[in-house]
C-alpha cells in the first residue's frame, strides 16, 4: 500500500474543508488535473485561444450594431416626400378595407320606405340588384325629362305642372288579370285602391289623354271633305309612244307623232275608252242598298222585216244603242275573264231518254252510316269499331224530321259509322283460336309483346286480351309486322273522332298521358289492353307532346 499517496490525499481533503469550498464548485481542470508547475503552459494556451474567439464574436456584434445604426439613419430619408407629416413611430390609420360579405345600407336608405312599385317589381322578378338598377335608370330618365321641361319653361312666371312621360307596357288583359290574381293570393288583405295605384303606375292615369293603343283601336273617321267626281283621264296618257333602235339612230328620218308605234295599256281592251258621264251620279252605291243582280236578258224573236235598216255595231265600238235592235250586252262588262265557247246544237234524238240511276247500295269498302238518337248510343256502346261523328250541317246531310217527331231537335241525333271490314273480322277464325290455346304462357307473352299489348301472369287473361284485339285488328299468326301499324292507325282514328283531343294536337298543346288514356279508353275499352310503350311510340310518330303530370 502506498502510504505516501494516501497521506497526500488526506491533506488535500483537509485543506478543502478548511477553506470552506464546495466539491461541486470545482472545475474540471482542478479536480482531474492537480495544479503543478508542469501544467502551467497548457492552461495559458487555452486562455489565449478563448480570448481570440471572444474578439471575433465581439467584432461581428459590433458590425451588426453599426449596420443597424446606418439603417436607422437612412430610414427617415426613404419616404420623406410622401409620409413627411406622419410620425415614423406611429403607423398610418388608413388601411386597405377588408372584403365584406354582407351588404350594408346607409341610415338614409333604411329610413326611406320602399315604394309600391319597388315592392311589386321585387316580388315579380326576385332580383333586388336588378330591380334597383331598373329603378335608378328610370329615375335618371325622369330627372333628365324634368330638367328639359324646366329649361323650356324658364321664362314663364307661372309654375307649370311637369308632365310625366307616358310609359306603356306589353301586358294585355289576360296577363294583367293573372298578375291581379297573384297579388290577391300573396296579399289577401290588399285594398282595391292599392291595386289601382299599381295599375296606374304601369299604364298611366286614364283620366288624361287616351293612350296610344286606345287611340289606335278607334275606327277611322270618315273624311268631311267631299271628293266629288273624278275627272276623266286625258286621252294622251292612255297610250305610250315607243321608238325602235333603228328609228332612234336614223337621223335623216323625220319622225312625226303619227308615225310612232303606239303600245296600248294592258288593261285596255281593243282601244275602248269608256268616258265617265257628267251627270251627278255617285261613284260608289250606298252600302244600305243591295247591288242589282246581273240577269240574263230575255230572248227576242228575230223580226222578218228586211226593209228596216239595222246598224251593225263593230265589237270595237263598245256603245250600247237602245234605239235600233235589241239590247246588246257587252260581255267584257259581265265577265272579263270568261272566254267565249262555241255552242253546238245537238238534235233531240241524240239526247238519251233513259238515264242511268246511281247504285245506292254501299260497296264493301264504304262505311255504313246510321243516324241514331243520342239516348240510343248507350245500347250500342259495346259494339267494337263504332265511330260516332257529329259533323257540321251541310246540304247533303240535312235531317228531315218525321211527322210524328217534329218537336225533337236536330241536335239530339248523331251520325254513326261502322266499317264493313271490322264487321267481318270481329271474331277470330277457329284456326287462330286453336293456335292461341295450344301456345304456352311464354309464347303468348312474346306474341302480345310483338303486337304491342299488355302482358299478364295468367294465360286466361292473355287469351281474353287477344280476343279483344282480334275484334279490332286482323291478327295473323304468320306475320306480325303490320299489326303494330294497324294499332297506330286505330289510335289515330280515335283521336280524330274526339274534337277536344284533335284541337290540342293541331295547336301543339301538351296532353297529360293519363288524360289521353282516359279519353281513349272511354271511346273504346280496347285501348286499356294496349301497352303504354306502344301508345308513347305512336304519340312520337304523330308529333303529340305527352306529359307525365
From Swiss-Prot:
Recorded superkingdom: Eukaryota
Alphabetical keyword list: DNA damage, DNA recombination, DNA repair, Nucleus, Phosphoprotein
Species the sequence originates in: Zygosaccharomyces rouxii (strain ATCC 2623 / CBS 732 / NBRC 1130 / NCYC 568 / NRRL Y-229)
Comp. bias regions, Low complexity: 96-108
Sequence similarity: Belongs to the SLX4 family.
Task of the protein: Regulatory subunit of the SLX1-SLX4 structure-specific endonuclease that resolves DNA secondary structures generated during DNA repair and recombination. Has endonuclease activity towards branched DNA substrates, introducing single-strand cuts in duplex DNA close to junctions with ss-DNA.
Biased amino acid composition, Polar residues: 24-41
Post-translational modification note: Phosphorylated in response to DNA damage.
Originating gene: SLX4
GO cellular component: Slx1-Slx4 complex
Stated name of the protein: Structure-specific endonuclease subunit SLX4
Compartment(s) where it occurs, according to its Swiss-Prot or TrEMBL record: Nucleus
Source lineage: Eukaryota, Fungi, Dikarya, Ascomycota, Saccharomycotina
Segments of this protein annotated with the region Disordered: 1-48, 81-127, 142-165, 275-319, 390-410
Biased composition, class Basic residues, residue ranges: 151-161
Amino acid at each position: 500500500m502506498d502510504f505516501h499517496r494516501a497521506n497526500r490525499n488526506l491533506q488535500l481533503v483537509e485543506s478543502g474543508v478548511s477553506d470552506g469550498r464546495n466539491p461541486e464548485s470545482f472545475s474540471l481542470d482542478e479536480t482531474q488535473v492537480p495544479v503543478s508547475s508542469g501544467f502551467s503552459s497548457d492552461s495559458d494556451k487555452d486562455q489565449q485561444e478563448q480570448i481570440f474567439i471572444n474578439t471575433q464574436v465581439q467584432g461581428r456584434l459590433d458590425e451588426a450594431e453599426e449596420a443597424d445604426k446606418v439603417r436607422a439613419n437612412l430610414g427617415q430619408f426613404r419616404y420623406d416626400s410622401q409620409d413627411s407629416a406622419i410620425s415614423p413611430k406611429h403607423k398610418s390609420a388608413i388601411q386597405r378595407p377588408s372584403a365584406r360579405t354582407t351588404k350594408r345600407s346607409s341610415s338614409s336608405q333604411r329610413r326611406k320606405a320602399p315604394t309600391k312599385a319597388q315592392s311589386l317589381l321585387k316580388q315579380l322578378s326576385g332580383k333586388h340588384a336588378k330591380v334597383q338598377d331598373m329603378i335608378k335608370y328610370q329615375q335618371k330618365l325622369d330627372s333628365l325629362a324634368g330638367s328639359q321641361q324646366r329649361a323650356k319653361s324658364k321664362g314663364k312666371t307661372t309654375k307649370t305642372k311637369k308632365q310625366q312621360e307616358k310609359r306603356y307596357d306589353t301586358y294585355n288583359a289576360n296577363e294583367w288579370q293573372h298578375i291581379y290574381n297573384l297579388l290577391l293570393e300573396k296579399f289577401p288583405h290588399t285594398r282595391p285602391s292599392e291595386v289601382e295605384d299599381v295599375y296606374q303606375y304601369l299604364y298611366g292615369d286614364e283620366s288624361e289623354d287616351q293612350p296610344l293603343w286606345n287611340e289606335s283601336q278607334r275606327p277611322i273617321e270618315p273624311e268631311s271633305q267631299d271628293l266629288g267626281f273624278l275627272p276623266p283621264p286625258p286621252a294622251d296618257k292612255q297610250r305610250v309612244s315607243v321608238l325602235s333602235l333603228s328609228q332612234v339612230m336614223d337621223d335623216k328620218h323625220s319622225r312625226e307623232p303619227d308615225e310612232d308605234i303606239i303600245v296600248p295599256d294592258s288593261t285596255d281592251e281593243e282601244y275602248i275608252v269608256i268616258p265617265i258621264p257628267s251627270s251627278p251620279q255617285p261613284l260608289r252605291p250606298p252600302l244600305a242598298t243591295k247591288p242589282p243582280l246581273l240577269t240574263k236578258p230575255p230572248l227576242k224573236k228575230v223580226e222578218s222585216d228586211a226593209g228596216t235598216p239595222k246598224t251593225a255595231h263593230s265589237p270595237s265600238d263598245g256603245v250600247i244603242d237602245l234605239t235600233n235592235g235589241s239590247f246588246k250586252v257587252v260581255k267584257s262588262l259581265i265577265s272579263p275573264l270568261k272566254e267565249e265557247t262555241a255552242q253546238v246544237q245537238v238534235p233531240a234524238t241524240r239526247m238519251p231518254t233513259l238515264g242511268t240511276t246511281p247504285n245506292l247500295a254501299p260497296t264493301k269498302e264504304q262505311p255504313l252510316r246510321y243516324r241514331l238518337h243520342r239516348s240510343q248510343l248507350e245500347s250500342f256502346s259495346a259494339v267494337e269499331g263504332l265511330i260516332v261523328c257529329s259533323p257540321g250541317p251541310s246540304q247533303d246531310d240535312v235531317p228531315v224530321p218525321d211527322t210524328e217527331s217534329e218537336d225533337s231537335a236536330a241536335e239530339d241525333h248523331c251520325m254513326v259509322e261502322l266499317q264493313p271490314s271490322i264487321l267481318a273480322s270481329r271474331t277470330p277464325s277457329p284456326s287462330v283460336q286453336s293456335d292461341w290455346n295450344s301456345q304456352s304462357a311464354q309464347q303468348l307473352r312474346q306474341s302480345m309483346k310483338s303486337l304491342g299489348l299488355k302482358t299478364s301472369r295468367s294465360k286466361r287473361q292473355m287469351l281474353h286480351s287477344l280476343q279483344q284485339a282480334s275484334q279490332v285488328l286482323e291478327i295473323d299468326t304468320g306475320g306480325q309486322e303490320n299489326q303494330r301499324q294497324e294499332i297506330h292507325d286505330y289510335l289515330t282514328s280515335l283521336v280524330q273522332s274526339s274534337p277536344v283531343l284533335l284541337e290540342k294536337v293541331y295547336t301543339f298543346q301538351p296532353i297529360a298521358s293519363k288524360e289521353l288514356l282516359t279519353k281513349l279508353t272511354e271511346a273504346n275499352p280496347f285501348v286499356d289492353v294496349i301497352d303504354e310503350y306502344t301508345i308513347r311510340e305512336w304519340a312520337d310518330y304523330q308529333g303529340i307532346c305527352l306529359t307525365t303530370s
